[in-house]
Amino acid sequence: MSLSTKLAITDVDLKGKNVLIRVDFNVPLDGDRITNNARIVGALPTIKYALEQQPKAVILMSHLGRPNGARVAKYSLKPVAAELSKLLGKPVKFLDDCVGPEVEKACKEAKGGEVILLENLRFHIEEEGSAKVDGKKVKADASAVEAFRKSLTSLGDIFVNDAFGTAHRAHSSMVGVDLPRVSGFLMKKELDYFSKALENPARPFLAILGGAKVADKIQLIDNLLDKVNRLIICGGMAFTFLKVLNGMKIGDSLFDEAGSKNVESMMAKAKKNNVEVFLPVDFVTADKFDKDAKVGSATAEEGIPDGWMGLDCGPKSSAKFAEVITTSKTIVWNGPAGVFEFDNFAKGTKSMLDACVKTCEAGNVVIVGGGDTATVAKKYGKEDALSHVSTGGGASLELLEGKALPGVVALSSK
């Protein structure tokens, strides 16, 4: 899908209007205390820009956690209102619902660029369209979903979607607001980077894929093999490739039985498309999956003995991967090279990160998919040293898999 044809917040006039913004304020809470406010900070450029345009009001809506279509006090967005007020340096009015006559009245009467935060969208089953009751999936009533969407629509004159993290969900607040729909700055930044990589990358284009299971990445690998020039396969899933392709002894390392059936066809596609594939040639091993495990080493040639497992790639692999990274122009990285949470098995991932930072400094583009790889960048304080660290794990993965994201499709075209 082309992402460059959608309207952005800067393409529309917000003066005197109620600007309804779908943000991602799904922040971690410890009681009433927000333990990481990064997602609130991420939405500030869009909120501040909207306020500068002299709107009637800025109305913010978000989900938090998984309250499963019911009102659950610990998932209230009320603590977020206080934090946002502090960050904006102006009052934020918190409403204790997100739809209904009282909310509609408060938004209608708002004036002078007032900032309003609505209560958690997911307190209503109509937001996600279903909920789990006693382990069974219960669907929301279609007419109730329609009424919920109608009430949300009535709150604004223009709808801004800045919640990339939920763009892969066809939820009411993402696709059901019947207003002109534009992207906010965070959403636009995500889409710009991914469209640059997927539609018009500087080459050589490298994808680095790590993580545990091949089966989880089949669609991703298949789509990227039509786009990239180079592919590094690392992390736990490398063992499945090495065992299938070279008959390598992998000891107690991860082996993905389901994913293994696709290895040969993927390699055949890589060969057909002239994609160079790089696999680890040596490993840091452990006698158990534990941060205090005994540490050993092994090569792909010798194999890993029984009773041992590979938890990281070794120094030769790291050196080769660094060379591939620093000679590529566009890099998409999804999945770590080893169990970086354990210090003894973090070197491969850290080496990869260092190479990515170095190639960025040389003017190349490095995009980090959300999830674990974003955690790696954060752990080592390198988020700002990379071109782009995605805020959406699931959403970025689905984009890279070639899927259309409902929240993006729903944006108005230029």
Curated annotation (Swiss-Prot):
Any idea which UniProt keywords this protein has? ATP-binding, Cytoplasm, Glycolysis, Kinase, Magnesium, Metal-binding, Mitochondrion, Nucleotide-binding, Phosphoprotein, Transferase
Q: Which positions are annotated as binding Mg(2+)?
A: 212, 215-216, 372
Binding site residues for (2R)-3-phosphoglycerate: 23-26, 39, 62-63, 65-66, 121-122, 168-169
E.C. designation(s): 2.7.2.3
- Could you tell me what reaction this enzyme catalyses? (2R)-3-phosphoglycerate + ATP = (2R)-3-phospho-glyceroyl phosphate + ADP
Q: Which chain positions lie within coiled-coil regions?
A: none
Domain of life, per lineage: Eukaryota
The record's listing under InterPro entries reads: Phosphoglycerate_kinase, Phosphoglycerate_kinase_CS, Phosphoglycerate_kinase_N, Phosphoglycerate_kinase_sf
CDD domains recorded: Phosphoglycerate_kinase
Pathway connected to this protein:
Carbohydrate degradation; glycolysis; pyruvate from D-glyceraldehyde 3-phosphate: step 2/5
Positions contributing to CDP binding: 211, 216, 235, 335, 337, 340
Residues with the Phosphothreonine modification: 299, 373
Principal subcellular localization: cytoplasm
Q: Which residues carry this modification: Phosphotyrosine?
A: 75
According to the UniProt entry, which residues carry Phosphoserine?
76, 143, 172-173, 183, 253, 260, 328, 351, 387, 390, 412-413
Q: Offer an example of a GO molecular function term for this protein.
A: ADP binding
What is one cellular component GO term in this UniProt entry? nucleus
* The protein's required cofactors: Mg(2+)
Q: Indicate the family of this protein.
A: Belongs to the phosphoglycerate kinase family.
Q: How does it assemble?
A: Monomer.
| Chain's role | Catalyzes one of the two ATP producing reactions in the glycolytic pathway via the reversible conversion of 1,3-diphosphoglycerate to 3-phosphoglycerate. Both L- and D- forms of purine and pyrimidine nucleotides can be used as substrates, but the activity is much lower on pyrimidines. Negatively regulates the biosynthesis of acetyl-CoA from pyruvate in the mitochondrion.
- Which HAMAP family has this protein been placed in? Phosphoglyc_kinase (MF_00145)
Q: What is this protein called?
A: Phosphoglycerate kinase
Organism whose genome encodes this protein? Schizosaccharomyces pombe (strain 972 / ATCC 24843)
**What gene name does this entry carry?**
pgk1
